[in-house]
Amino acid sequence: MSLILLPAVDVVEGRAVRLVQGKAGSENDYGSALDAALCWQRDGADWIHLVDLDAAFGRGSNRELLSEMVGKLDVQVELSGGIRDDDSLNAALATGCARVNLGTAACENPHWCAQVIAEHGDKIAVGLDVQIVDGQHRLRGRGWETDGGDLWDVLENLDRQGCSRFIVTDVTKDGTLDGPNLDLLASVSDRTNVPVIASGGVSSLDDLRAIAKFTERGIEGAIVGKALYAERFTLPQALAVVRM
């Protein structure tokens, strides 16, 4: 099974940006979010990981734009950012996206999250945004501004609720081009039987080769952001590596 690559388009005020370690104010602007997504589609992407950072930070939303983008793309879209209640969930699903990624809600409102998982099944993934502090694996919420509890406790609860997929990010790696946290990915994939998508730190084709070795252990895909925008490699090059 080949590793699925999901180019990331993180949106702030309609622009495609990349943050460093998820910190507001660390944005690098890469132009129109729609143009970025269409570029990755032209380059061969099967999926786009589309994130409303304004909604994630609770400072507004790009809801109309994201809906327009999903409508104009021919590839599958995983939609994320600020989806924490029925209104934001229904708006996300109404775009026609293939999958919605919940983050903060899994920590702050586990009862609602369980209901959503039960109702929508594999259209729901949960993002596990992890920060390792003094050896403890802590989850981060609200745009990585708040503590969301112990990773392993939350993972066990979500597994029990029937969550169909997890997106695992080491927040200290995201946007740094420092390489992925392979130990974290292995630990999570070994504790669940559902697919895991890796996120954060990919900087080279060798990083993708390393992640691809974990497909038999349940790593289904990898989100790639900064490395593509910084032209460390092209998407066609990356796809060729993981499809070998």
UniProtKB/Swiss-Prot annotation:
Its EC number is 5.3.1.16, 5.3.1.24. The active site is at residues 10, 129. It is found in: Cytoplasm. The keyword Ribonucleoprotein does not apply. Its main location: cytoplasm. HAMAP family: HisA. Belongs to the HisA/HisF family. PANTHER family: 1-(5-PHOSPHORIBOSYL)-5-[(5-PHOSPHORIBOSYLAMINO)METHYLIDENEAMINO] IMIDAZOLE-4-CARBOXAMIDE ISOMERASE. This is Phosphoribosyl isomerase A. The gene is priA.
